[in-house]
Amino acid sequence: MALNLRKNHQILKIINDALIDLPAPSNISTWWNFGSLLGICLITQIVTGLLLAMHYTADTSLAFSSVAHMCRDVQFGWLIRNLHANGASFFFICIYLHIGRGLYYGSYLNKETWNVGVLLLLALMATAFVGYVLPWGQMSFWGATVITNLFSAIPYIGQTLVEWAWGGFSVDNPTLTRFFALHFLLPFVIVGLTLVHLTFLHETGSNNPLGIPSDCDKIPFHPYYTIKDILGFVLMLSLLVSLALFAPNLLGDPENFTPANPLVTPPHIKPEWYFLFAYAILRSIPNKLGGVLALAASILVLFLTPLLHTSKLRSMTFRPLSQILFWTLVANVLILTWVGSQPVEHPFIIIGQLASFTYFTIILILFPLAAALENKLLKL
């Protein structure tokens, strides 16, 4: 009998084991679609980004006009740019939902997969930040200035570190050039990390909504979940194309239509919407170093979640107290996002401080306490 090429060819075998014959739990819901959606986001961003890089000029005197030229003179350049800019927003929507799913269903107990996932989030945030600087508009320039300046809060080496990152004494041409180089490089780092993420995931297999082992009831990934994923792709890409065609500037800052000017500071310097929650945490602490530490902690706290799991049940499906806390945390992050977009004045300052305090309290204190209490109530 002839060998089945799909199952025996060195390379096809890897693809087969990851996407076709992969044993998957029979009951995973739509919340498990976001991993593949993130893969589609990554591919879309790399393809559109490559096409944009072919027309972009990484020079302070030409960057802004090269982006304008792309939108005016390049065939479908406006579409490619709008897809790329809004694709970033969809990337973050998907990753935040993906992380939320992981927190709710206890997926973080696959420790290696989770930790690589947090590294992926950090890499994505770095990529988005350096990418936002490239059009060299007002918010690009001042965003870069404000965020890179945070490193100067590091004791002793801070100022040297910032000037080394800038390549001079302010954000200027060398900064733009290196940010373009980093923005080109980092997505490929993300691809590499994604493969590591999947390798670790396929060691243990997917979690499921019940949070119980599903070895006794597995189904092949293809055709069941390939079809389910394709439905997700169609829905997400429809939304992305609709946003890029009907409201391409909805999520952008009007300030970025003005070329960068080091002599004029915009009235409200704020990042893109997907960083606002972290920006609100940064601003809520009146000390520079303290703010930077809180900003870092807001993301790095995710590394601690596997260590803070005190429940005897993996998922929150049967844990009503933890569910209430989880949805409170979601509402809290939305409040932080809103506060981050507001000016630094009363009452936003105190709201931001309370929301920042609540964010860390829920994750570090209330989640473990509620889980321990549920163990008692359920006599586990």
From Swiss-Prot:
Q: Which Gene3D superfamilies match?
A: Cytochrome Bc1 Complex, Chain C
What membrane topology does the UniProt entry give? Answer: Multi-pass membrane protein
Q: Which residues bind heme b b566?
A: H98, H197
Q: Where does a ubiquinone bind?
A: H202
**CDD domains, sorted:** cytochrome_b_C (cd00290), Cytochrome_b_N (cd00284)
Entry annotated with the keyword Membrane: yes
Q: Which UniProt keywords apply?
A: Electron transport, Heme, Iron, Membrane, Metal-binding, Mitochondrion, Mitochondrion inner membrane, Respiratory chain, Transmembrane, Transmembrane helix, Transport, Ubiquinone
Residues that, per the record, bind heme b b562: H84, H183
| Principal subcellular localization | mitochondrion
Question: Where, by residue number, does the polypeptide cross the bilayer?
Answer: 34-54, 78-99, 114-134, 179-199, 227-247, 289-309, 321-341, 348-368
One GO BP annotation is:
mitochondrial electron transport, ubiquinol to cytochrome c
Entries under InterPro entries matching the protein:
Cyt_b/b6_C, Cyt_b/b6_C_sf, Cyt_b/b6_N, Cytb/b6-like_sf, Cytochrome_b, Cytochrome_b_C_euk/bac, Cytochrome_b_N_euk/bac, Di-haem_cyt_TM
Named from the GO MF annotations, one term is:
metal ion binding
Task: Quote the cofactor binding remark.
Answer: Binds 2 heme b groups non-covalently.
Q: How does it assemble?
A: The cytochrome bc1 complex contains 11 subunits: 3 respiratory subunits (MT-CYB, CYC1 and UQCRFS1), 2 core proteins (UQCRC1 and UQCRC2) and 6 low-molecular weight proteins (UQCRH/QCR6, UQCRB/QCR7, UQCRQ/QCR8, UQCR10/QCR9, UQCR11/QCR10 and a cleavage product of UQCRFS1). This cytochrome bc1 complex then forms a dimer.
The entry assigns this protein to a family as follows:
Belongs to the cytochrome b family.
Main role?
Component of the ubiquinol-cytochrome c reductase complex (complex III or cytochrome b-c1 complex) that is part of the mitochondrial respiratory chain. The b-c1 complex mediates electron transfer from ubiquinol to cytochrome c. Contributes to the generation of a proton gradient across the mitochondrial membrane that is then used for ATP synthesis.
Q: What is the protein name given in its UniProt record? A: Cytochrome b
